[in-house]
Each structure stands twice: as structure tokens, then as C-alpha cells.
Amino acid sequence: MLDKEKKAEIINKFKLHDTDTGSPEVQIALLTERINNLNAHLQVHKKDHHSRRGLLKMVGQRRALLNYLMKTDMERYRAIIEKLDLRK
């Protein structure tokens, strides 16, 4: 789970303007951080299937946001992929 400071840091890094908290970039960055944390948890707790289901749901949500961003603005999509290092 993200604490307030970490969440604020991520929002500040990816926001488009001063009061931005809900742009696709911010949402994708927050989901990516939560996914990475949950992934580390599942490496240790392999049989935690409830958390695995939540992880899959978050990955699907991030995928939908990325698809939306790709359809609306390809340049912003490429920038967020590059910043978060999502593609290998």
C-alpha cells in the first residue's frame, strides 16, 4: 500500500498541471507503483490468491488506461511508457 508521501511524490512527478490528480498519466503511475508492491508481496507469499486476483484487476485497469491514452494521444502514451519503463 502507498503511504501519503510516496503517493504525493508520484503525483508531483507525473502531473500535467498544479491541481492534477486524475489524469491518465497520474493514474497509470499510481497503479504501476501498487502493482510493483503487490508483485513483491506475491514473490514471498506465493499462495496468496486473493491478492493475486487484485493484482490482475489492477493490471487490467492500467491496461485500459494505457489503451485510452494510446487512442487519444500517442505522444503522451509513448512518454508514459518511457518514463515508467513498461515495455522491454
From Swiss-Prot:
Keywords: Ribonucleoprotein, Ribosomal protein, RNA-binding, rRNA-binding. The keyword RNA-binding applies. GO terms for cellular component: cytosolic small ribosomal subunit. Signal peptide: none annotated. One of its GO terms (molecular function) is structural constituent of ribosome. The keyword NAD does not apply. GO terms for biological process: translation. SMART domains: Ribosomal_S15. InterPro entries: Ribosomal_uS15, Ribosomal_uS15_bac-type, uS15_NS1_RNA-bd_sf. Belongs to the universal ribosomal protein uS15 family. Part of the 30S ribosomal subunit. Forms a bridge to the 50S subunit in the 70S ribosome, contacting the 23S rRNA. One of the primary rRNA binding proteins, it binds directly to 16S rRNA where it helps nucleate assembly of the platform of the 30S subunit by binding and bridging several RNA helices of the 16S rRNA. Forms an intersubunit bridge (bridge B4) with the 23S rRNA of the 50S subunit in the ribosome. PANTHER family: RIBOSOMAL PROTEIN S15, BACTERIAL AND ORGANELLAR (PTHR23321), SMALL RIBOSOMAL SUBUNIT PROTEIN US15M (PTHR23321:SF26). This is Small ribosomal subunit protein uS15.
